[in-house]
Structure formats: C-alpha cells, structure tokens
A protein has these predicted regions:
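Non-catalytic C-terminal interaction segments of nucleic acid-processing enzymes
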Residues: 1-10, 14-17, 153-176
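Nucleic-acid-binding surface
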Residues: 10, 14-21, 26, 54-129
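A short acidic, leucine-rich amphipathic alpha-helix
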Residues: 26-35
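Short amphipathic alpha-helical interaction segments
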Residues: 36-51
Length: 176
C-alpha cells in the first residue's frame, strides 16, 4: 500500500506521530515523505502545528522538531539518518510505532516486522546486547553513514541488514 494512500486525510496525525518518535527531522525529509500534498496544503499543516505548539523549527529552518529541547539533545544526526531509511521503506509500511532501544521505530509490512536502528558508535554496544533478545523473525535495519561502523556490529544469522545513508537519502542496503 502506498504511504500517500495510508496517510491521506490523516497527515497531521502522521506528522505528530513521526515527530514524537524521531524528535527531530530535516524539513526537506518531512516534505519528501508527504510529497503527495500540494505546497499550500503542506504549508498549512506546518503552520497549524507550529501555532498549536506541536512543532518547532530550528533558527535556520533546516530542522523540524517537537520542541527546542529535541534540537539540543545531541541525537539529531541519528534521527535524521533513521528517518531517511523510513522514507525509503514508506510504501511497505502498514503500521508503525516507537520501539524499545536500541531501535527508534518499529513497523509492519505485509510480510514482516522491522526495527529501524541507528548504527551510531554510541549505539553499537546496545545493538550487540539486544541481538539475542530480538526475535529472529524481526528484520533489523541498522542505519549508518559509514560502512566501517557495521564491522563492529555482531549480526544475527538472519534478518540483519545495514542501511548506508548519505546526505540525500539511502544509498545502499547490505545483507549482514
């Protein structure tokens, strides 16, 4: 099912839900995710969220967040990287929710369940510790901006993938 179809007429709720889970994303990412909206409709939604105190914009206008604190918590890069992976997978998403650490978000597709996990250096110990706790049927998508980071991850026998993200989105997905 196309994400645009699933989100139609519920864009405000989807944006609030996504911002609550991720904390902070780039404005261009959110615009790309909701590219089915006209510029006017999208602008009206953001203006409404800002007016109601549900969205905050960084001073340079690059980031969209749930609060000023979200911009300062130091995990902006992790959130942005994982959001690129969510955008890549959007048309496979049937439902999504916040996940238990080390994952940021879990989503279901028609065939499988997925965890989107930031592969930052600080998160590697938690990823390795959780490898035996997470069910084998769940696909772990470990999002990194440098392939060498994946060398530190202890992969499970099945269903572990590395997602390489660049400044403009997902560049490649690797089976681990």
């Amino acid at each position: 099912m196309k994400f645009a179809y699933a989100a139609r007429d519920r864009e405000v709720a989807f944006i609030i839900r996504l911002l609550t889970i991720f904390g902070v994303v780039e404005q261009r990412q959110m615009r790309l995710l909701f590219d089915h909206l006209s510029n006017r409709s999208y602008g009206q939604i953001l203006a409404r969220l800002r007016r109601e105190g549900l969205a905050f914009f960084s001073p340079d206008g690059q980031f969209l967040a749930t609060s000023r604190y979200s911009l300062d918590h130091g995990k902006t890069l992790e959130s942005v990287m994982v959001f690129w992976a969510f955008i890549k997978m959007r048309d496979n998403v049937l439902d999504f929710c916040a996940s238990d650490p080390p994952a940021i978000l879990s989503f279901s597709s028609a065939a499988k369940d997925y965890d989107l996990i930031s592969g930052s250096k600080q998160n590697i110990p938690a990823i390795n510790a959780a490898r035996t706790v997470v069910a084998e049927a769940i696909v772990r998508l470990i999002v990194v901006d440098d392939l060498s980071t994946l060398d530190e991850v202890e992969p499970r026998l099945v269903n572990d993938y590395g997602v390489l993200v660049g400044p403009n989105g997902v560049e490649r997905i690797y089976k681990m």
